[in-house]
């Protein structure tokens, strides 16, 4: 049996297909440029060879997940819960996890019980902000990482809207 996870965020669609031993047999990450249905069709179409005619389970998460859940008739899993389950399964020694989405940021503390926090929908300090900075610097996310690795000064940036 294969397990398909679909993450529909504010800027991207991600898919992972896992086998029964939790090995990734297919994965894809694609920007949707506000054409979510087309992008979902593309990422699902891309995994058809992998799926073949095997039995599958499917679930969707992310900020766009509820509407996709209704559209496709598949279960929805809240994104912080989905992320916490993935962390506990794949990297159980993790103490703290931080996830920067396109319009929000989430932090999960895993030691001494689970505590989760998430900011309101806002691009300040999130992936959309980082994308904008990359564009202004005429690079991409990988380029931002390369530029940052030799830093000499840390500059404060706003981490909230307004």
Feature-to-residue mapping (PLM):
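Short, intrinsically disordered, charge-balanced linker/junction segments flanking boundaries
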Residues: 152-162
């Amino acid at each position: 049996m294969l397990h398909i996870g679909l993450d529909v965020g504010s800027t991207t669609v991600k898919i992972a297909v896992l086998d029964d031993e939790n090995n990734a047999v297919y994965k894809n990450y694609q920007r949707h440029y506000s054409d979510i249905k087309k992008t979902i069709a593309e990422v699902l179409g891309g995994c058809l060879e992998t799926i073949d005619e095997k039995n599958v389970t499917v679930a969707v998460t992310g900020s766009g997940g509820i509407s996709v859940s209704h559209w496709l008739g598949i279960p929805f899993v809240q994104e912080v819960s989905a992320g916490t389950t993935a962390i506990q399964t794949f990297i159980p020694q993790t103490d703290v996890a931080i996830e920067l989405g396109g319009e929000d940021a989430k932090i999960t503390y895993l030691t001494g019980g689970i505590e989760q926090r998430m900011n309101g929908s806002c691009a300040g300090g999130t992936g959309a902000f980082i994308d904008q900075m990359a564009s202004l610097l005429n690079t991409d996310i990988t380029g931002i990482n390369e530029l940052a690795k030799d830093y000499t000064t840390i500059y404060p940036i706003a981490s909230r809207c307004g």
